[in-house]
């Protein structure tokens, strides 16, 4: 596979990432900030199953800082997802470079406190989380495995946009 084939393969991967992120955001993530009545009982039950199965304290009892991240996901990221999916499925859209860099840096930045909380926070009954959350190191790693792709894929996107010669090259504009 040559450079063009590798680039197209990664563009398709990123296209699927952004396309898959739309239903995840709408149906699961935003339950933390949108009115409960917007969601049918089946989706609320699905989220509750996820919270119990993965012991996710951030969605069970979202702290204000986490709600602010969900709000940013609603206002800034969700509108970007279909645009990015289109650009990467179409391929060769150099105009996506700057928005993709902004998205990737923003997302990776939000994941640092999320991952730090899941790895280091006190989930005892005395904490903000009132005993909800992972109890063992294995449970923490299991939960982190859900969140870590949302750090790693934006990191791949960032490196792709910054280092790939195709996206890195600037078109020379003719002087009038």
UniProtKB/Swiss-Prot annotation:
<feature type="transmembrane region" description="Helical; Name=3">
    <location>
        <begin position="100"/>
        <end position="120"/>
    </location>
</feature>
<dbReference type="Pfam" id="PF05241">
    <property type="entry name" value="EBP"/>
</dbReference>
<keyword id="KW-0472">Membrane</keyword>
<feature type="short sequence motif" description="ER retention motif">
    <location>
        <begin position="172"/>
        <end position="176"/>
    </location>
</feature>
<feature type="transmembrane region" description="Helical; Name=4">
    <location>
        <begin position="142"/>
        <end position="162"/>
    </location>
</feature>
<dbReference type="GO" id="GO:0030867">
    <property type="term" value="C:rough endoplasmic reticulum membrane"/>
</dbReference>
<keyword id="KW-0539">Nucleus</keyword>
<dbReference type="InterPro" id="IPR016964">
    <property type="entry name" value="Sigma2_recept"/>
</dbReference>
<comment type="function">
    <text>Sigma-2 receptor which contributes to ameliorate dysfunctional cellular processes and slow degenerative progression by regulating cell functions including cholesterol biosynthesis/trafficking, membrane trafficking, autophagy, lipid membrane-bound protein trafficking, and receptor stabilization at the cell surface. Forms a ternary complex with PGRMC1 receptor and low density lipoprotein receptor/LDLR at the plasma membrane, which increases LDLR-mediated LDL cholesterol internalization.</text>
</comment>
<dbReference type="GO" id="GO:0005886">
    <property type="term" value="C:plasma membrane"/>
</dbReference>
<dbReference type="GO" id="GO:0031965">
    <property type="term" value="C:nuclear membrane"/>
</dbReference>
<feature type="site" description="Likely important for receptor folding">
    <location>
        <position position="56"/>
    </location>
</feature>
<keyword id="KW-0812">Transmembrane</keyword>
<dbReference type="GO" id="GO:0042632">
    <property type="term" value="P:cholesterol homeostasis"/>
</dbReference>
<protein>
    <recommendedName>
        <fullName>Sigma intracellular receptor 2</fullName>
    </recommendedName>
</protein>
<comment type="subunit">
    <text>Homodimer. Interacts with NPC1; the interaction impairs NPC1-mediated cholesterol transport. Interacts with PGRMC1 and LDLR; the interaction increases LDL internalization. Interacts with histatin 1/HTN1; the interaction induces HTN1-stimulating wound healing. Interacts with TSPO.</text>
</comment>
<keyword id="KW-1133">Transmembrane helix</keyword>
<dbReference type="GO" id="GO:0015485">
    <property type="term" value="F:cholesterol binding"/>
</dbReference>
<dbReference type="InterPro" id="IPR051987">
    <property type="entry name" value="Sigma-2_receptor-like"/>
</dbReference>
<dbReference type="GO" id="GO:0008142">
    <property type="term" value="F:oxysterol binding"/>
</dbReference>
<feature type="topological domain" description="Lumenal">
    <location>
        <begin position="31"/>
        <end position="68"/>
    </location>
</feature>
<comment type="similarity">
    <text>Belongs to the TMEM97/sigma-2 receptor family.</text>
</comment>
<dbReference type="GO" id="GO:0005783">
    <property type="term" value="C:endoplasmic reticulum"/>
</dbReference>
<dbReference type="GO" id="GO:0032377">
    <property type="term" value="P:regulation of intracellular lipid transport"/>
</dbReference>
<feature type="topological domain" description="Lumenal">
    <location>
        <begin position="121"/>
        <end position="141"/>
    </location>
</feature>
<dbReference type="GO" id="GO:0005791">
    <property type="term" value="C:rough endoplasmic reticulum"/>
</dbReference>
<feature type="topological domain" description="Cytoplasmic">
    <location>
        <begin position="90"/>
        <end position="99"/>
    </location>
</feature>
<dbReference type="GO" id="GO:0090303">
    <property type="term" value="P:positive regulation of wound healing"/>
</dbReference>
<feature type="domain" description="EXPERA">
    <location>
        <begin position="10"/>
        <end position="158"/>
    </location>
</feature>
<feature type="binding site">
    <location>
        <position position="75"/>
    </location>
    <ligand>
        <name>cholesterol</name>
    </ligand>
</feature>
<dbReference type="GO" id="GO:0032383">
    <property type="term" value="P:regulation of intracellular cholesterol transport"/>
</dbReference>
<dbReference type="GO" id="GO:0005764">
    <property type="term" value="C:lysosome"/>
</dbReference>
<dbReference type="InterPro" id="IPR033118">
    <property type="entry name" value="EXPERA"/>
</dbReference>
<feature type="site" description="Important for 20(S)-OHC binding and stereoselectivity">
    <location>
        <position position="150"/>
    </location>
</feature>
<dbReference type="GO" id="GO:0140077">
    <property type="term" value="P:positive regulation of lipoprotein transport"/>
</dbReference>
<feature type="binding site">
    <location>
        <position position="77"/>
    </location>
    <ligand>
        <name>cholesterol</name>
    </ligand>
</feature>
<feature type="topological domain" description="Cytoplasmic">
    <location>
        <begin position="163"/>
        <end position="176"/>
    </location>
</feature>
<feature type="transmembrane region" description="Helical; Name=1">
    <location>
        <begin position="10"/>
        <end position="30"/>
    </location>
</feature>
<feature type="topological domain" description="Cytoplasmic">
    <location>
        <begin position="1"/>
        <end position="9"/>
    </location>
</feature>
<keyword id="KW-0256">Endoplasmic reticulum</keyword>
<feature type="transmembrane region" description="Helical; Name=2">
    <location>
        <begin position="69"/>
        <end position="89"/>
    </location>
</feature>
């Amino acid at each position: 596979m040559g450079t063009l084939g590798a680039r197209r393969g990664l563009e398709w991967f990123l296209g699927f990432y952004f396309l898959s992120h739309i239903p995840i955001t709408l149906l699961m993530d935003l339950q933390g900030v949108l009115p409960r009545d917007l969601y049918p009982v089946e989706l609320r039950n699905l989220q509750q199953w996820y919270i119990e199965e993965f012991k996710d304290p951030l969605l069970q009892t979202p702290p204000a800082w986490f709600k602010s991240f969900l709000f940013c996901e609603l206002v800034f990221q969700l509108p970007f997802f279909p645009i990015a999916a289109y650009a990467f499925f179409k391929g060769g859209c150099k105009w996506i470079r700057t928005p993709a860099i902004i998205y990737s840096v923003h997302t990776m930045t939000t994941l640092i406190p999320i991952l730090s909380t899941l790895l280091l926070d006190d989930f005892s009954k005395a904490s903000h989380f009132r005993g909800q959350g992972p109890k063992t190191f294995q449970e923490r790693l299991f939960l982190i495995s859900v969140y870590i792709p949302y750090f790693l894929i934006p990191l791949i996107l960032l490196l792709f946009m910054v280092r790939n010669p195709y996206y890195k090259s600037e078109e020379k504009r003719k002087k009038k």
